[in-house]
Amino acid sequence: MGLMRQLAVVALICQVVGCTPSHTPPISAADTEDFIAGALRPWGAGRLAITDPDARRFAVYDSALVALVMLRRGRRDDAGLILAGLAAVQADDGALPFSFTAPGPDKIRFVRSGAVAWVGYAATEYLDAESGGHERALALRLAVKAATYLLAHRVGGLVTGGEGDIRYEVDARGVHERIEPTTLEWISVEHNIDTYFFLRALARVTESPAYAEAASQLAAALSTRGWREDRGQLARGIGDVLDPVRALDCASWGAVFLAAIHDSRASRAYETAEHAYAVRDPRTGTSGHRPYADGPIFEDPRLQQFYQASLPSPSWDRLSAVWPEGSAGVALAALRTGHVERARAILDQLEPLRMRGDAMPTFTLDIPFTFDTEPSIAGTAWVELVRFEIARGPDRPTLWVQ
């Protein structure tokens, strides 16, 4: 379907009955309104959520999540402004910068397919939620261009990683990060889960068989090639070499994906996420989940050696720290596999971590180039989104629905 033809379907989908209610009460026990809304900054004709105010750094994934929260709070105009801000940084080929520092995206493209998919997904929710809104044409254009980029970067039905590779240089002055221009050929399972739900949503709002077929092909390839029977979860990556890393998102989000395609392995993936990554943070007494089950903290041996003296543990299985964003993903997996009370309990266990503005921290421990303990847009938004799902009940899902 050509771009102009797809844009023409706006008039046809204006009457779509959405899955996201237009007006809802606060979606969390904690009022995060000040933090979420306070992160928005003017950008072009719209707004973007600033990830790191001190560094003036923006991440499009964070902005997409804030747009989803705004839709659930009944703040449709604010969600539309965020989509306008995201459209302002979208390239002609549909790519979006994973993150960038003001005043604008870097000259070297740093694109991650998962972030592109989340932006597209937020745009489709805007279209699906209500028939009105000033940014319908913009939202459809944003989503279609994002899909065009992703579908142009497929191998065997799966999307590849994106563009720009992070390189680290270690010398006497410390560690320096740079981005090397390149097209990434590796296949991230997480990115493909993101893309699946985006394409399914876009197929629904545009009534396009092409998007539905692309999503079906992706699901078939991912469920077949991505599953690790020996680990009870989806792998982190798919390629010629077996990926040894056990990543939480590929267990938790993997469970949500498998549940959506009615694959019985969803329950096993949830159990893996729940137990293999479980941790208690001794500094706060909070229980939750860590991002990786085992392996070195840094995969780059130079970074591992440089920071080994300052790390409390050399490996993830011995690191006692909680990742709120990831824990919320486990809660969603619990909900989608029939463990409603456990889903609620996982989120309740995170509440003591609330910081200024009732934000969740990124992590409960600082790890250079990986995690910090600053207020997290993504972590805060994920907790709110999953609380909203729990409040509605398992029979009325809104996030990542089939």
Residue ranges with predicted function:
Residues S63-A79, L83-L86, A251-S252, L258, ...:
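Alpha-helical support elements that line or immediately flank enzyme active sites
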Residues L7-V16:
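Bacterial N-terminal signal peptides
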Residues M1-L7:
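Bacterial N-terminal signal peptides that target proteins for export
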Residues P25-Y61, A95-F98, I108-G114, D128-E325, ...:
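Extended ligand-binding clefts on enzyme/binding-domain cores
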Residues R76-V119, Q349-I367:
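Helix-terminus loop motifs that line ligand-binding clefts
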